[in-house]
């Protein structure tokens, strides 16, 4: 037995399911979760001291690697001045200025403490600004665990939303319409019927919660045009893609400007931070300027702002994203080659330092196609890679991430581990 096994048993006595976020429980792959003791650079070390090359990166934030010395020092310096004040600080201004500089669609920004809080607040703001109640989201896109967003599709595009979790009132779910990602015709048809009631369309510009699925050409542009036509706000959930696929986020990468943007993960440099922002006339509806209420005790926490600002400084350095994209492509291409040599069908998607591997013969562009991939092979592959010291997301529906800390040797070791793992999975 491992120490992780013992810790998981102990955790289940006082923590529901033994984890504080469900995907960590390894339900999607089976077995006991790995309990992490520490991390540095591209590596994590479990409670037994085993080293893993990490492609989860705390689900995205660790773009510069774990415990980056400059980020750690920024946190130490900020902490010496106090952990939290519940009052305005200068560092909040610096963070807001930098975010608005990097993401030109954001005239103003409000800091919060998580991505979920950012999306919940952005939707409330969109409803308050437009005076409408309905929202459109897409199947397979995850926007946090707010009640309005834990809704699945009904039996057809125009049906009312259905709660996907107990505790979500049906009356609230009715206002959420869940459509097919990358299907602009379905959006157009829906808006033709209820467009005057829709406050916003919220979308992950690159879906990262049905693995990694980029938008098909014209999809984001079409959403922008339809929102303009029907007077709805377009919200880009860039909690995952913000500062990950490009310095200006997916909106810069694809050249589409939303009305509101939600951010998280990288903006906190590993600390719990979220943000939402956008057009000035929309953001000015927020209290204390306007009637839409939003607040938070730890919003703009000075230690978290210090970590985030230093991370933004690091990723703004020349060549950062070119190198990150190159490294990701080297790793993905190497794994695909290994799959081909093992006779295992596999496709992949990549945008910048974000990637997805699918056990499928066909390209994957939406949630249904993602569910048709070979989940049993993924589970076997995951555990083979874990045994060989490569830590992938413990779910076939989660994107992977490369950091600037991954070395050429790390990439080569990963590709070799994949080749051995895929041969084992294939039985050859």
Swiss-Prot record:
What Enzyme Commission number does this protein have?
5.4.3.8
Under catalytic activity, the entry for this protein gives:
(S)-4-amino-5-oxopentanoate = 5-aminolevulinate
Q: Which InterPro entries match?
A: 4pyrrol_synth_GluAld_NH2Trfase, Aminotrans_3, Aminotrans_3_PPA_site, PyrdxlP-dep_Trfase, PyrdxlP-dep_Trfase_major, PyrdxlP-dep_Trfase_small
Cofactor(s), by name: pyridoxal 5'-phosphate
Sorted keywords for this record are: Cytoplasm, Isomerase, Porphyrin biosynthesis, Pyridoxal phosphate
Protein's cellular compartments: Cytoplasm
UniProt enzyme class: isomerase
Q: Which GO terms describe its biological process?
A: protoporphyrinogen IX biosynthetic process
Q: Which residues get modified to N6-(pyridoxal phosphate)lysine?
A: 265
Self-association state and partner proteins as the record states = Homodimer.
Matching NCBIfam families: hemL (TIGR00713), PRK00062.1 (NF000818)
Q: Which family does it belong to?
A: Belongs to the class-III pyridoxal-phosphate-dependent aminotransferase family. HemL subfamily.
Q: Tell me the protein's name.
A: Glutamate-1-semialdehyde 2,1-aminomutase
Naturally occurring in which organism (per UniProt): Thioalkalivibrio sulfidiphilus (strain HL-EbGR7)
Tell me the name of the encoding gene: hemL
């Amino acid at each position: 037995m491992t120490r992780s096994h013992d810790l998981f048993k102990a955790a289940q006595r006082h923590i529901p399911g033994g984890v504080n976020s469900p995907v960590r429980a390894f339900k999607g792959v089976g077995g006991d979760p790995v309990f992490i003791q520490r991390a540095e650079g591209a590596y994590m070390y479990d409670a037994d001291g085993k080293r893993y090359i990490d492609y989860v990166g705390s689900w995205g934030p660790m773009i510069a690697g774990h415990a980056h010395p400059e980020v750690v020092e920024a946190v130490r310096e900020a902490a010496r001045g106090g952990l939290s004040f519940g009052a305005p600080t200068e560092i909040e201004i610096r963070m807001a200025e930098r975010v608005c500089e990097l993401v030109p669609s954001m005239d103003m920004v409000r800091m919060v403490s998580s991505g979920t809080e950012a999306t919940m607040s952005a939707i409330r703001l969109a409803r308050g600004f437009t005076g409408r109640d309905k929202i459109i989201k897409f199947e397979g896109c995850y926007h946090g665990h707010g009640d309005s967003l834990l809704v699945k599709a009904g039996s057809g595009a125009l049906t009312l939303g259905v709660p996907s979790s107990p505790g979500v009132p049906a009356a609230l779910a009715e206002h959420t319409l869940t459509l097919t990602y990358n299907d602009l015709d379905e959006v157009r048809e829906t808006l033709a019927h209820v467009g005057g009631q829709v406050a916003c369309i919220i979308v992950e510009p690159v879906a990262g919660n049905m693995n990694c699925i980029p938008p098909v050409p014209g999809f984001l542009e079409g959403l922008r045009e339809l929102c303009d036509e029907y007077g709805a706000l377009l919200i880009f959930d860039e909690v995952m893609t913000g500062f990950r696929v490009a310095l200006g986020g997916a909106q810069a990468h694809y050249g589409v400007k939303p009305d509101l943007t939600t951010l998280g993960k990288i903006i906190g440099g590993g600390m719990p931070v979220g943000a939402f922002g956008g057009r000035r006339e929309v953001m000015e509806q927020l209290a204390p300027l306007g009637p839409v209420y939003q607040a938070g005790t730890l919003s703009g926490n000075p230690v978290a702002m210090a970590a985030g600002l230093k991370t933004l400084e690091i990723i703004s350095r020349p060549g950062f994203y070119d190198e990150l994209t190159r490294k990701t492509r080297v790793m993905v291409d190497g794994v695909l080659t290994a799959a081909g040599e093992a006779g295992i069908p596999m496709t992949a998607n990549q945008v910048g330092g974000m990637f997805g591997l699918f056990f499928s013969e066909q390209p994957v562009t939406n949630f249904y196609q993602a569910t048709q991939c070979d989940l049993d092979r993924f589970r076997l592959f995951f555990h083979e890679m874990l045994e060989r010291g490569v830590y992938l997301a413990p779910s076939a529906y989660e994107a992977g991430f490369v950091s600037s800390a991954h070395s050429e040797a790390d990439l080569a070791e990963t590709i070799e581990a994949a080749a051995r793992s895929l041969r084992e999975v294939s039985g050859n």
